[in-house]
């Protein structure tokens, strides 16, 4: 546990609550002190939904600490069972309330005797895993619970659907453009002649989980949530799964090919002409292939970019920038430290360096050092970009309200390629735009940022040196500032004056 004013992935209980509140008619009870119960406010603020967040906080206060939690927790479970009539009540502690080391499983067993609902305790180690790992584990736990329950109650043989069908696992609340991606995935599968069997957890019902094994395969669009459930279904029911994220033209094609291979292995009469479909979608429906050959996109060739986000989105955007748009990715990184090996393997050869960290100050210093033409990251990278005057396109959670758009903006599938192309192109400062603004927009009043974003900088700029720096055109100012600071460090100077600026200029032969 550490104190931070910014976290990329939240504590474990947030992941459990995100999964629980994505299902229909599932209620979550959070055993937590005041201060840990911000999930309701966060979800109500960000998600474009009319429903109340189905989460109740069972507050740990001084009375609970004096008498124990059993009475209060059981009372909250039975009360919500009578008030809401949910199909499932899931109890989760937080990392703070876990310190009490209470036997919550015993509380759940006791409450389950008097409840019509199913009651389970989230099986998550709150000290070892983060929000995304906990969400993945909770989804797998709920699916396992209901499938084992159905198996114990019925011995009927499993029957697959007549037509090719798929489950989509991992679409859930507060995800990055998850609702839009889900619509695009439905369209893609429908085009391939594949029926949607179940979508979990978003909008799904736990009473239908026993229908999951009827599908021919599972589609996992995001690595962060759904892989554990897919592996469980593969091991127990021999269900294949596709974990290629269909983001960008090449990976969408790879995803379609994997789906077709799975369907053909089960049904030899399936003769969908996917080659023609891919060709038509790539050439006429998606504008990305045409755009990447246009003069507008060619102007971006060789420009430097930095990518940072969750493993799925950061890896996919890195490959799109490098393979499909010819943009140089100076650094690609992720905050999913638990998936570092997979991430390195995916971006190998597509970027100059890789950064695996959940410390935003390291990301900020890396961006300040590289000075890219554009950043593609999370809400935090947007803030960093504003401080450094570098444009940023948001490509990954965590994000704020402006990245929960009302309009249709998927990142997956062929429509997603159009959205990504727009985002990439609009994120770069175009041509002479910056210079023309200085010429026709009066004096350049932008403050020159002279420090790195961490607190360990050892250089200061004299006022006259800053004034001279502001006279330099914007498109070379950053390079000159960087060279001057490098020269000052070599000469062990803590204050950069005009004399040092001119000496640095002579030293680099300018």
Curated annotation (Swiss-Prot):
Query: What GO CC terms are in its UniProt record?
Result: chloroplast
- The main location class comes to plastid
- Active site at 296 (proton donor)
Q: In which pathway does it act?
A: Porphyrin-containing compound metabolism; chlorophyll biosynthesis (light-independent)
List of residues binding substrate:
431-432
Per its UniProt record, the required cofactor names are:
[4Fe-4S] cluster
Where does the UniProt annotation locate this protein?
Plastid, Chloroplast
Question: Is Chloroplast a UniProt keyword of this protein?
Answer: yes
Q: Where does [4Fe-4S] cluster bind?
A: 36
Q: Which reaction does it catalyse?
A: chlorophyllide a + oxidized 2[4Fe-4S]-[ferredoxin] + 2 ADP + 2 phosphate = protochlorophyllide a + reduced 2[4Fe-4S]-[ferredoxin] + 2 ATP + 2 H2O
GO terms in the biological process aspect are: light-independent chlorophyll biosynthetic process; photosynthesis, dark reaction
Q: What is its EC number?
A: 1.3.7.7
Q: Which SUPFAM superfamilies match?
A: Helical backbone' metal receptor (SSF53807)
User: Could you tell me which HAMAP family the record lists for this protein?
Assistant: ChlB_BchB
- Note the subunit structure: Protochlorophyllide reductase is composed of three subunits; ChlL, ChlN and ChlB. Forms a heterotetramer of two ChlB and two ChlN subunits.
Q: What does this protein do?
A: Component of the dark-operative protochlorophyllide reductase (DPOR) that uses Mg-ATP and reduced ferredoxin to reduce ring D of protochlorophyllide (Pchlide) to form chlorophyllide a (Chlide). This reaction is light-independent. The NB-protein (ChlN-ChlB) is the catalytic component of the complex.
UniProt-listed NCBIfam families? DPOR_BchB (TIGR01278)
Q: What is this protein called?
A: Light-independent protochlorophyllide reductase subunit B
């Amino acid at each position: 546990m550490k104190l931070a004013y910014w976290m990329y992935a939240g504590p474990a209980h947030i992941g459990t609550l995100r999964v629980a509140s994505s299902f229909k008619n599932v209620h979550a009870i959070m055993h937590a002190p005041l201060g840990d119960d911000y999930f309701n406010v966060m979800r109500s603020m960000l998600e474009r939904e009319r429903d109340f967040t189905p989460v109740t906080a069972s507050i740990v206060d001084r009375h609970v600490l004096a008498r124990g939690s059993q009475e209060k927790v059981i009372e909250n479970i039975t009360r919500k069972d009578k008030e809401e009539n949910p199909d499932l009540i899931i109890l989760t502690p937080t990392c703070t309330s876990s310190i009490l080391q209470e036997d919550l499983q015993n509380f759940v067993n006791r409450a389950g005797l008097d409840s019509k609902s199913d009651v389970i305790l989230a099986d998550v180690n709150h000290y070892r895993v983060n929000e995304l790992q906990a969400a993945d584990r909770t989804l797998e736990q709920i699916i396992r619970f209901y499938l084992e329950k159905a198996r114990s109650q019925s011995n009927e043989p499993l029957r697959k659907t007549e037509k090719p069908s798929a489950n989509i696992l991992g679409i859930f609340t507060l995800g990055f453009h998850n609702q839009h991606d889900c619509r695009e995935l439905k369209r893609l599968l429908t085009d391939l002649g594949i029926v949607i069997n179940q979508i979990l957890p978003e909008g799904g019902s736990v009473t239908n989980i026993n229908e999951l094994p009827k599908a021919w395969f599972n589609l996992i669009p995001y690595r962060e949530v759904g892989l554990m459930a897919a592996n469980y279904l593969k091991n127990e029911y021999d269900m294949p799964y596709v974990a290629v994220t269909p983001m960008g033209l090449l990976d969408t094609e790879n995803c379609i090919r994997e789906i077709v291979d799975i369907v053909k292995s089960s049904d030899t009469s399936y003769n969908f002409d996917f080659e023609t479909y891919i060709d038509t979608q790539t050439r006429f429906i998606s504008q990305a292939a045409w755009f990447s050959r246009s003069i507008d996109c060619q102007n971006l060739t060789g420009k430097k970019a930095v990518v940072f986000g969750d493993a799925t989105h950061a890896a996919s955007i890195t490959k799109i920038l490098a393979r499909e748009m010819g943009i140089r990715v100076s650094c690609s990184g992720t905050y999913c430290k638990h998936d570092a090996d997979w991430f390195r393997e995916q971006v190998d050869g597509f970027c100059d360096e890789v950064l695996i960290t959940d410390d935003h100050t390291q990301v900020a210093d890396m961006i300040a050092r590289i000075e890219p033409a554009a950043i593609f990251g999370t809400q935090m990278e947007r803030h960093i970009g504003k401080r450094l005057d570098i444009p940023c396109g948001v490509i990954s959670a965590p994000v704020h309200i402006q990245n929960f758009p009302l309009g249709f903006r998927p990142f997956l599938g062929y429509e997603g390629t159009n959205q990504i192309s727009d985002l990439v192109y609009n994120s770069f400062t175009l041509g002479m735009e910056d210079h023309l603004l200085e010429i026709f927009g009066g004096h350049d009043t932008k403050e020159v940022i002279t420090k790195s974003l961490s607190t360990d900088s050892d250089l200061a700029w004299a006022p006259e040196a800053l004034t001279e720096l502001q006279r330099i055109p914007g498109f070379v100012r950053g390079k000159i500032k960087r060279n001057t600071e490098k020269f000052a460090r070599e000469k062990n100077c803590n204050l950069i004056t005009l004399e040092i600026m001119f000496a640095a200029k002579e030293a680099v032969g300018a």
